[in-house]
Amino acid sequence: MRRLIPVLVAGLLASCAGPRSLEVKQFVLRDTGADYGEDAMVRSEKLRRLHGAIGVKEQAERLGQYYTVLWKDDSQGPVRVIFEYQQGGSGSLIKREVRDFDPTAISGQADFSVVGENFRNKGRVLAWRISLVRNGEEIASKRSYLWQ
C-alpha cells in the first residue's frame, strides 16, 4: 500500500499539468471515397475536409495534407504561427506559410494545407517545422523527424 501512494500522487500531479503551448495534428486525405470500413474518426475527418466539394474535380483539389496547430500562450503581444515545409518534388526549397493573430489572444488554432495543384505537382510534404512566435521571440516549435 505504501508503494501505491507515491504512484497515485505522481499520477494526480501529472493530470493537473496545463495544456501544451503548441500541438500539431496531421491528416492526409488520400482519396475521396467514403469507406465505411474505416475508423469512424478517420471517416469523419475525411468528410469534414470534403464538405462543400460537389464535383469530382472539386473533391480531387482537396486531396493532400492538412495540419492543424493548436497554441496557447498567456503573455501579450503580436502572435505568429509559422509553417515551414519541404516537398518531395521541390528539392531543398523550403516553403513558408504564416498566420497572424490578435495581440490579445492567449490561444488559437491555425490551419495549414498542402493540397490541389501544389500537392499534385510538388508531391507530399517530407519535412516540416511549425513555430509559435510572440513579440518576435520563438515561444515553442515542433518539427517532423526529417526536418534539419
Where do the protein language model's features map onto the residues?
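Sec-dependent bacterial lipoprotein signal peptides
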Residues: 1-16
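Bacterial Sec signal peptide processing site at the extreme N-terminus
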Residues: 14-33
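Contiguous beta-strand segments within globular domains
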Residues: 40-73, 109-114
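A short beta-turn/strand-edge loop motif at beta-sheet boundaries
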Residues: 59, 73-79, 121-123
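Short, aromatic- and glycine-rich surface loops/edge beta-strands on solvent-exposed regions
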Residues: 83, 124-134
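Short proline/glycine- and polar residue-rich coil/turn motifs
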Residues: 100-108
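Short beta-strand elements
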Residues: 139-148
